[in-house]
Structures are given as structure tokens and as C-alpha cells.
Amino acid sequence: MKTIIFKDFQFEAAHYLPYVPKMHKCRRLHGHSFFVRLELKDKINEKNGWIIDYAEIKLAFQPIYDQLDHHFLNDIPGLENPTSEILAKWIWHRLKPKLSILNTIIIKETCTSGCIYQGF
């Protein structure tokens, strides 16, 4: 039986979406308090009783966080069109090699809108 654990992060960043219609509100420069949830799935280690130390998750995500927090996302290579979907995929490809049991990334731009990415 496998268990899913999660660690949440939040970062502030500005962006705009260059490929939406000119009059669309997301075409203008704006910012968000982005919410990121990393979900990891594995068997519970019988010896220590956990899947992974939460500190290891934070350590693996820290360089990505530093690249995103208080930055203009469109200037980051690979995020020229920084939709929630593309951002989730971008994070996945940087984090999965460090956290092989990464199962899901959830991105929320607002409290009502977001993306769930499972990196198949």
C-alpha cells in the first residue's frame, strides 16, 4: 500500500500571457501569490515510519523557489508563456530527477483557479 504526502510552498511573481487575445486581462502584466503543492507517493518506510523527510523536499525545491520568487516569470527560460499548466510542467522536469517519488504538482494562481499536473 502506498501513501501520498505533500509539502506546500508559496511564492510571489509577475507575468503576462503573450498568446491570449490582446484585450484579455491576462495579456497585461500582473502578479500572483502562487501556491505550489508537491505530492509524493511511496510506501511508508517500516524503520522510520515516513516516506521522506519534509526537509528533503524543501531542500530539493529551494533552487526552483529561488528562481521563481519575486521574479518576472516570462524572463525565465522555458516560461516565456507562463500559464499554470506550463509552470507545473516546468517545475516537474526540474524536480522529478531530485525527487523520484514525486507524484503530483498543484499550482494555484488564485484561491479559485489552478492546475494539477501528474507528469506522465
Swiss-Prot record:
Any further remark recorded for this protein: The active site is at the interface between 2 subunits. The proton acceptor Cys is on one subunit, and the charge relay system is on the other subunit.
Family of this protein: Belongs to the PTPS family. QueD subfamily.
One Gene Ontology term of the molecular function aspect: 6-carboxytetrahydropterin synthase activity
Pathways involved: Purine metabolism; 7-cyano-7-deazaguanine biosynthesis
Native organism taxonomy: Bacteria, Pseudomonadati, Pseudomonadota, Gammaproteobacteria, Enterobacterales
Annotated active site: C26 (proton acceptor), H70 (charge relay system), E109 (charge relay system)
Any single GO BP term: queuosine biosynthetic process
Protein's UniProt keywords contain Zinc: yes
Originating organism: Buchnera aphidicola subsp. Schizaphis graminum (strain Sg)
Task of the protein: Catalyzes the conversion of 7,8-dihydroneopterin triphosphate (H2NTP) to 6-carboxy-5,6,7,8-tetrahydropterin (CPH4) and acetaldehyde.
Binding site for Zn(2+): H15, H30, H32
CC cofactor note: Binds 1 zinc ion per subunit.
Catalytically driven reaction(s): 7,8-dihydroneopterin 3'-triphosphate + H2O = 6-carboxy-5,6,7,8-tetrahydropterin + triphosphate + acetaldehyde + 2 H(+)
PANTHER family: 6-PYRUVOYL TETRAHYDROBIOPTERIN SYNTHASE, PYRUVOYL TETRAHYDROBIOPTERIN SYNTHASE
Keywords from the UniProt entry: Lyase, Metal-binding, Queuosine biosynthesis, Zinc
EC number(s) per entry: 4.1.2.50
Name this polypeptide is given: 6-carboxy-5,6,7,8-tetrahydropterin synthase
Cofactor requirement: Zn(2+)
